[in-house]
């Protein structure tokens, strides 16, 4: 079991991982590719101490290189959901299940807006993971809404199991989509159905489907971990980066403004030190109960 699972391999997550590793904890980072960090897109950064004029890509390469050099394990994968398990948490990492005593959420700004019907039909036709739920739609019609070329992998897999796959790209250039998939360039408006999904309403038409796969880089934090207190899009934390759930911390852009690397890195370090204290207290408690 991991001591600390970190969700997001941006500045906040990597900063937390480095300090966690130095404090001898079993730490692992689960993150989308480096290029999805917000800072990767910055042309030039002049306000991070010691790195004047660096590009976002260079900064991320340095941060990631530093983490790897001291032995931090980084798994490039998306965390789909986190379930509380008494004194630990179970992570669904693209259908691989990993248990951790503590969790640090460092997932950046949730770039996704919620589609009408998304909450209502989640688990009843709406899914965030093709690998996890694809087999349930064998022989059926589904639609995939993708916000980047990464979603094309999921759609291609669904084309192998589903009777019909529609694909709605929320970006311009398609990269490697299977030819069996029908591309629909229209804005999704609303997921419809009675008890389960029956279709997707678009700007000028609608699709009759049993499944709606929403494949985006980030999953709203409130969806990632049920019961997590949020304030709008931001995870609610105190000064020690503790959330309302025991053993769960948050750091960086996902806790709200200001959106700055220095703040993300500082919060990552605060969060992990708090996780270390929590783990040490857990260990003492376990020893007393032996
Ligand atoms: C164009 C631009 C220029 C900027 N310039 C500056 C600047 O000059 N100075 C400055 O201080 N700040 C700048 N910023 C802000 C800075 O980028 C952010 O404050 C910083 O990246 C926050 O770090 P973070 O780790 O919290 O989030 P991010 O860097 O966004 O990293 C979060 C990571 O988590 C991943 N993730 C999300 N959900 C999941 C999941 N479920 N499973 C796995 N991974 C997940 C994301 O894909 C992403 O890789 C700029 C931002 C932009 C967009």
Can you name each region flagged by the protein language model?
Residues 74-138:
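Glycine/small-residue-rich loop that forms an oxyanion/phosphate-binding "nest" at active or ligand-binding sites
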Residues 8, 106-107, 145, 213-216, ...:
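Short, well-ordered coil/turn residues at beta-beta hairpins
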Residues 13, 81, 110-111, 151, ...:
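Glycine-rich nucleotide phosphate-binding loop and flanking beta-alpha elements
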Residues 114, 120-136, 216-263, 267-273, ...:
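FAD-site-proximal beta/loop scaffold in flavoenzymes
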Residues 39-41, 115-119, 135-137, 173-180, ...:
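Short loop/helix-cap segments at secondary-structure boundaries that form the rim of catalytic
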Residues 1-3, 76-77, 138-140, 245:
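Phosphate-coordination loops involved in phosphoryl transfer and adenosine-cofactor binding
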Residues 67-86, 90-92, 98-100, 160-239, ...:
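A Rossmann-like FAD-binding core segment of flavoenzymes
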Residues 2-58, 66, 140-174:
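Beta1-alpha1 glycine-rich phosphate/pyrophosphate-binding loop at the start
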């Amino acid at each position: 079991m991991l001591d600390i699972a970190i969700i997001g391999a941006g500045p906040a997550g990597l900063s937390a991982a480095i300090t966690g590793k130095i404090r001898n904890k079993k730490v692992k980072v689960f993150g989308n590719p480096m290029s999805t960090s917000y800072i990767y897109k910055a042309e030039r950064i002049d306000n991070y101490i010691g790195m004047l004029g660096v590009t976002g890509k260079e900064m991320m390469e340095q941060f990631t290189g530093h983490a790897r050099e001291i032995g931090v394990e980084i798994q490039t994968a998306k965390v789909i959901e986190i379930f509380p398990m008494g004194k630990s948490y179970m992570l669904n990492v693209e259908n691989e299940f990993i248990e951790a005593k503590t969790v640090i959420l460092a997932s950046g700004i949730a770039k996704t807006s919620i589609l009408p019907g998304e909450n209502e039909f989640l688990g009843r036709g709406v899914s965030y993971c093709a690998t996890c739920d694809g087999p349930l739609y064998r022989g059926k019609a589904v639609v995939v809404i993708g916000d980047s070329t990464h979603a094309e992998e999921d759609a291609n897999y669904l084309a192998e199991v589903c009777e019909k796959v529609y694909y709605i790209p929320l970006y311009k250039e398609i990269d490697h989509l299977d030819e069996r998939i029908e591309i629909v360039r229209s804005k999704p408006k609303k997921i419809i159905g009675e008890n389960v999904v029956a279709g997707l309403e678009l700007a000028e038409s609608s699709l009759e489907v049993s499944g709606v796969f929403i494949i985006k880089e980030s999953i709203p934090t409130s969806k990632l971990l049920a019961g997590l207190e949020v304030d709008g899009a931001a995870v609610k934390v105190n000064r020690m980066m503790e959330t309302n759930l025991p053993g769960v911390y948050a750091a960086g852009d996902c806790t709200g403004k200001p959106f700055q690397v220095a703040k993300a890195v500082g919060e990552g370090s605060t969060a992990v030190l708090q996780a270390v204290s929590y783990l040490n207290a857990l260990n003492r408690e376990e020893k007393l109960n032996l």
